[in-house]
């Protein structure tokens, strides 16, 4: 059985706008290439392209998914946050939260990103695939119930697991977040 790979180019259309996070260069901090935001679609496109040119792409079971529903999101995030996120994404006039910006289309991209993770989890739990990888963007591992943080807008894995729990009842899983940095992670 091959590895299922969940990807949708539309997830990469999310933009942080002109916001650029800069860190002092030196020590172990490399100068940024250009003025793009640290969390940007090119790193994910590069990963996908490497899979293709290496020939590994041909051994993957490439799949797509539908966006998560608002009902799915509300199992993890608060109604005020979801309302603010949807409004901000529709007009792009505010930057609620701690370390991220929401622009037009952010809600749709984040919902689709979480949808990829939800489908990956559902397919593994149903044993229709043995293992899965979701190339999901924007990421979700730092998002909190009341706010997006750390460039994460929706808590993708939490949304996927709560959706699975709602469908299957009791669910026992382990989540390993391998993200090497200080703070929320």
Please state what every model-predicted region is.
Residues 1-176, 180-185:
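HDAC/HDAC-like amidohydrolase catalytic core signature
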